[in-house]
Design a protein with these regions (language model features):
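Conserved small/polar residues in nucleotide/adenosyl-binding loops
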Residues: 208-209
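Secondary-structure transition/capping motifs at alpha-helix termini
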Residues: 166-171, 194-203
Length: 209
């Protein structure tokens, strides 16, 4: 279920972290740049009401990214952070979970370069929705605006639109990758986008894992 830890609007400070790394895929070394940041959602009065946190991986040796695919991914629940698709599937580094003689399914795990990472062909954005992971509800009185099927999808679309504008990715093919309830989130978000006309009909493809 969602967590409801809150911050006073006048004390919330958006966070942003950047780093660089390299990964070898199919024998080729690929450099990437990572930006982890709050994506703040503001109310009509201009005060922050919530934040969706994103972990974005950009391949940094690509000169023209305007048409490069972007995969937006999240877990389900609802109420789960993106930790599982991040550390177990799509991140440049992941847990080593294929040890056949492992005594327990629980951690600690070794962390290795992810041989199945998609960074060679697409940029990757992992998402913590409001109330999960580092995604926070800032104004407790606005719960009803985020904790519901349509509300959750609407908040996701709001942040996706802002992210696409911020990084000039309007022409990029965009894929919504959801696990479990994340598939429902993707379908609802795509449905909202498809029925809102040209303002939001920017083209989404769905991936279910």
């Amino acid at each position: 279920m969602y967590k409801t830890e809150s911050f006073k609007p006048d004390t919330f400070k958006p966070a942003r972290f950047e780093s660089d790394g390299k990964i070898t895929l199919s024998g080729k070394e690929i450099p990437y740049h990572t930006i982890c940041e709050d994506n703040v959602i503001y109310g009509p009065d201009g005060n922050p009401v919530a934040s969706i946190f994103t972990y974005a991986y950009f391949r940094s040796d690509v000169e023209d990214t305007a048409n490069r695919p972007v995969v937006f991914a999240y877990n389900g629940g609802p109420g789960s952070s993106c930790m599982y698709v991040h550390a177990g599937f799509l991140g440049t580094r992941r847990m080593q979970y294929d040890e056949v003689d492992r005594e327990s399914a629980f951690g600690p795990y070794k962390v290795i370069d992810n041989p199945d990472c998609l960074i060679d062909i697409a940029d990757i954005v992992l998402i913590d929705p409001v109330g999960t992971g580092y995604g926070v509800l800032i104004d407790e009185s606005k719960k009803k605006d985020f904790f519901g099927i349509e509300q959750d999808a609407e908040a996701l679309l709001t942040v996706l639109e802002a992210w696409v504008r911020r990084y000039n990715r309007g022409l990029s093919p965009k894929y919504l990758c959801g696990e479990s309830y994340g598939c429902t989130r993707s379908a609802v978000a795509a449905g909202i986008a498809a029925t809102m006309g040209r303002e939001r009909g920017y083209g989404l493809s769905l991936i279910h894992i």
